[in-house]
Swiss-Prot record:
Family: Belongs to the ATPase delta chain family.
Quaternary state and interactors: F-type ATPases have 2 components, F(1) - the catalytic core - and F(0) - the membrane proton channel. F(1) has five subunits: alpha(3), beta(3), gamma(1), delta(1), epsilon(1). CF(0) has four main subunits: a(1), b(1), b'(1) and c(10-14). The alpha and beta chains form an alternating ring which encloses part of the gamma chain. F(1) is attached to F(0) by a central stalk formed by the gamma and epsilon chains, while a peripheral stalk is formed by the delta, b and b' chains.
Keyword Heme: no
Protein name as it appears in the record: ATP synthase subunit delta
Length: 185
């Protein structure tokens, strides 16, 4: 319940406001890059996460650190947005806001996000085949792939799009076979 409230009252409105700003100034792609940069910065530094979330640190100190980290790396409007988040004491929701912004852009552009796990790294032909499969499954105009490797799959792929999971892995096939055999006895 608490996460739903935070999402509805903080994350969604700020992400929607950022998208509105991006649309007004034709900066959707630029803000895509800026949000990705910020998500990566925050994810890669536990110290930065703690610093931004600490209510005892003065807002001006947080702004200075953000300016130093993003100088010449993000658009000025996006930097102003970061400063607004600090002023409104919402900067600790930065990663969630950025991720929601990226989801809104995908929805706007009819792009599906596919999380693909395979036993080995996919080559270009395999990536194209997965993209086409996801387009067929979802009716999306394009697909954004997030890939990961899991040798325990033995072979094949597991594709997750939203709440749908397409398991074409050897491990999944063996599991289904064992369930079928167990039910038969």
């Amino acid at each position: 319940m608490m996460q739903t409230t935070v999402r509805g009252e903080v994350v969604e409105p700020y992400a929607e406001a950022l998208l509105s700003l991006a649309q007004t100034h034709n900066l959707i792609d630029q803000f895509q890059q800026d949000t990705q940069l910020m998500v990566e910065l925050v994810a890669s530094s536990g110290e930065l996460q703690q610093f931004l979330a600490n209510p005892l640190i003065k807002p001006e100190a947080k702004k200075n650190v953000l300016r130093q980290l993003t100088v010449d790396k993000v658009h000025g409007y996006f930097l102003n947005f970061l400063m607004l988040l600090v002023d409104r004491r919402r900067i600790n929701f930065l990663s969630s806001i950025c991720e929601h912004y990226r989801a809104l852009v995908r929805k706007l552009r009819n792009v599906a996000l596919a999380e693909v796990t395979s036993a080995v790294e996919l080559n270009d032909d395999q990536r194209r085949a997965v993209v086409e499969k996801v387009k067929t499954m979802t009716g999306a105009a394009d697909v954004e792939l997030v890939t990961a490797c899991d040798p325990e799959l033995i072979g094949g792929v597991v594709i997750k799009v939203g709440s749908q999971i397409f398991d074409a892995s050897l491990r999944g096939q063996l599991r289904r076979l064992s369930v079928t055999l167990a039910q038969a006895t």
